[in-house]
């Protein structure tokens, strides 16, 4: 009867930890390099919209710049099988900022769709869910498709552009931070106004500084959340292994100190990092929602250019965190019930030492 009771307790712990561990598998979707329909349970989906005159002009300018880069790439190293005139068609050029594109973003990868046709999925690497780095990577991948040097491995150019973007952003942020301490010399040099600076020029330079700081903050935030999530998954694996070892201890029939203590520690750490990761994910999603256009048009800055929706992966994350909140008190109650009291352990140690001394005397 006692064995059956312990087996039921361990089975419950095993099933709960196994379920929460398996619910991490969708986080590794959206990274398939194969064609067809790769599975993608995204944390969120976003599309670019031109909701105002400002965003329309901004997006149009970027698209024209990417069109120019596409032409240069084709002229300097085009070697695909298409006829030369067809290579300059719009469908063969970089379309990162096309309004029909839908980006499905996950922790470790993203998928890009154009309407109902899914184009490709690739890994984010350490950039996490940073949408700016994602767009830069997409530009690099598409340029790689147009280049003879990278047409067989387009991810190389995408990763190179992301590395250049992050390095340039870090250097620019450091320079602007130092320039503030020197009295904003850069705007004065650029505008050639000496020590004088108009209100319009000052507001423009401040907006530029805020834009760089925002992009730099998003880059750091997503990198930190990326490594926190990896550590969270690692703790989840250790927690599952601890439950298995704890089950062997229950079957053996002896109360332990080490295994129940480890179970309490790993379950506590798991919930802490899972809560941090979930809170950061939710905060990031809410920040992106602020870049959506207001349907009423009451509150607007003119720069709302995203349409963001929570994905199926976010719902799975909510379920997983809920299971982990249930698992923590159960793990503590079970560990406290089957842990060996310190007094009893001390008494056992004393008896062992007495037996050893008796054996030596004999």
Curated annotation (Swiss-Prot):
Topology Lumenal: residue spans: 28-232, 289-312
Lipid bilayer topology: Multi-pass membrane protein
Top-level lineage group: Eukaryota
GO cellular component terms, semicolon-separated: cytoplasm; prospore membrane
Keywords, comma-separated and alphabetical: Membrane, Sporulation, Transmembrane, Transmembrane helix
Keyword set includes Chaperone: no
Cytoplasmic topology ranges: 1-6, 254-267, 334-362
Predominant location: membrane
Transmembrane segments: 7-27, 233-253, 268-288, 313-333
Claim: Transmembrane is one of the keywords in the record: yes
GO biological process: spore membrane bending pathway
Location(s), subcellular: Prospore membrane
Cited function: Involved in spore and ascus formation. Required for the efficient assembly of the precursors of the prospore membrane to a continuous prospore membrane.
Family (UniProt): Belongs to the SMA2 family.
Protein name: Spore membrane assembly protein 2
């Amino acid at each position: 009867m006692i064995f059956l009771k312990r087996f039921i307790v361990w089975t419950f712990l095993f099933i709960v930890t196994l379920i929460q561990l398996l619910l991490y598998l969708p986080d590794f979707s959206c990274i398939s390099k194969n064609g067809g329909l790769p599975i993608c349970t995204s944390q969120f989906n976003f599309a670019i919209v031109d909701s105002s005159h400002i965003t329309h002009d901004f997006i149009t300018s970027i698209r024209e710049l990417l069109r120019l880069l596409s032409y240069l790439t084709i002229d300097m190293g085009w070697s695909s099988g298409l006829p030369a005139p067809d290579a300059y068609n719009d469908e063969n050029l970089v379309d990162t900022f096309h309004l029909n594109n839908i980006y499905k973003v996950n922790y470790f990868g993203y998928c890009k769709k154009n309407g109902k046709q899914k184009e490709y999925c690739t890994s984010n690497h350490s950039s996490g869910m940073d949408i700016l780095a994602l767009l830069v990577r997409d530009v690099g991948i598409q340029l790689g498709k147009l280049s003879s040097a990278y047409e067989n491995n387009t991810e190389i150019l995408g990763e190179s552009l992301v590395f250049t973007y992050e390095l340039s952003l870090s250097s620019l942020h450091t320079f602007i931070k130092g320039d503030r301490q020197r009295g904003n010399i850069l705007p004065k040099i650029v505008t050639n106004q000496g020590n004088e600076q108009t209100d319009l020029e000052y507001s423009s330079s401040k907006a530029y500084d805020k834009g760089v700081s925002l992009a730099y903050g998003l880059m750091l935030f997503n990198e930190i959340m990326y490594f926190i999530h990896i550590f969270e998954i690692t703790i989840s694996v250790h927690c599952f292994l601890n439950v298995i070892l704890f089950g062997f201890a229950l079957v053996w029939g002896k109360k332990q100190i080490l295994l129940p203590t480890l179970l309490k520690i790993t379950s506590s750490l798991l919930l802490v990092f899972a809560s941090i990761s979930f809170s950061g994910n939710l905060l990031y999603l809410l920040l992106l929602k602020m870049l959506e256009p207001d349907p009423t048009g009451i509150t607007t800055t003119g720069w709302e250019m995203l349409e963001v929706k929570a994905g199926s992966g976010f719902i799975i994350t909510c379920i997983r965190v809920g299971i982990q909140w249930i698992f923590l008190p159960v793990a503590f109650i079970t560990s406290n019930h089957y842990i060996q009291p310190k007094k009893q352990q001390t008494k056992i140690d004393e008896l062992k030492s007495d037996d050893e001394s008796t054996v030596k005397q004999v």
